[in-house]
Design a protein with these regions (language model features):
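Small/aliphatic-rich secondary-structure junction motif
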Residues: 1-56, 133-136, 150-215, 234
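Structural beta-alpha unit
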Residues: 40, 75-111, 206-237, 243-250, ...
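A short acidic, glycine-rich active-site loop
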Residues: 55-71
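Hydrophobic alpha-helical segments and helix pairs
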Residues: 85-143
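Structural alpha-helical scaffold elements that stabilize or flank donor/cofactor-binding regions
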Residues: 101-104, 130, 174, 230, ...
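Glycine-rich, Arg-bearing micro-motifs that act as flexible, cationic patches
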Residues: 113-130, 239-262
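Short, flexible loop segments at boundaries between secondary-structure elements
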Residues: 148, 262-271
Length: 271
């Protein structure tokens, strides 16, 4: 069961979306919410946007704005948690954003992040790196204003790999509470691999209402996953985060990257 959910905070509409998703997930599991706000140092700002024509004075002004608007940020977070009847803690740090978020993610069962959106500087500036290095599950949410349900109908993207096995195990709290779960085999049939039917049997022993399905091998894995998820009206995809190396990511056809930017459905990733 999920008992602690971490949500990174900043002064953006993306932060409001993360809070909304955290509320939905926390109410589902009666979980504690950890709000984490990290104000980047000038040095970190310069590393994050090295090719932008910003002077130190401009960056100092930006840092000052972040500090002075922090109170409004916390008011919004606390109001959302209180209105939802949730228990919460708040943490504010100053330093390297990515490092602090990885640190606090290890004190939670799940971290809420945004899916990639072209042209934006996300609070987690390298989501794949964040997932691989934090070592704990994340919920990557699309650009929408509300998340009325997360995990009522779930598609599990299955491929016989350590990453997918870990994702299924970590997602058990969601899977056990779902009304419908489909385990979709992605890729060509491999007689030496663990089939989706066996994973379904394993999940059924945990009380999951589940069935197996086979994806169309004619399309890319990401397209197969998204089509099947939308066809069953899923509100969550569970997937292993593939990305040991650039070579591995190329071999997998960029599945993780594609799902991280699908902007249609929340994705539960684990590695």
């Amino acid at each position: 069961m999920l008992k602690a959910i971490m949500v990174p905070l900043d002064n953006t509409t993306d932060s409001e979306r993360r809070i909304a998703a955290a509320v939905t997930a926390a109410q589902k599991f009666e979980a504690h919410v950890l709000g984490v706000h990290v104000i980047p140092t000038i040095e970190h700002m310069m590393q994050t946007i090295p090719y932008m024509p910003y002077s130190v004075d401009i960056l100092q002004d930006q840092q000052h704005i972040l500090k002075t608007t922090a109170m409004a940020l916390w008011d919004n977070f606390e109001s959302s948690m209180t209105h939802a009847g949730l228990l919460f803690d708040r943490y504010q740090e100053e330093g390297d954003v990515q490092s602090y978020l990885k640190l606090y993610s290890r004190c939670a069962d799940l971290t809420i992040i945004n899916q990639n959106a072209g042209g934006k500087f996300p609070i987690v500036d390298d989501m794949t790196s964040f997932m691989l290095e934090s070592g704990l599950p994340v919920l990557a949410i699309p650009e929408q204003s509300a998340y009325p349900t997360i995990g009522k109908r779930i598609l599990v993207a299955w491929k016989d790999s350590a990453q997918c096995g870990r994702a299924v195990h970590d997602a058990l709290p969601f899977l056990q509470m779902a009304d419908e779960v489909i385990v979709l085999s992605v890729g060509e049939y491999d007689r030496k691999a663990v089939p989706a039917a066996d994973i379904c049997l394993h999940l059924a022993r945990h009380g999951v209402t589940v069935e197996a399905a086979q994806g169309d091998i004619g399309d890319t894995p990401a397209e197969v996953i998204l089509y099947a998820a939308e066809n069953m009206n899923a509100d969550l995809i569970v997937a292993g985060a593939w990305g040991h190396s650039r070579v591995t990511e190329m071999i997998m056809g960029g599945v993780t990257k594609s799902l991280l930017s699908n902007q249609r459905l929340p994705v539960f990733f684990s590695h």
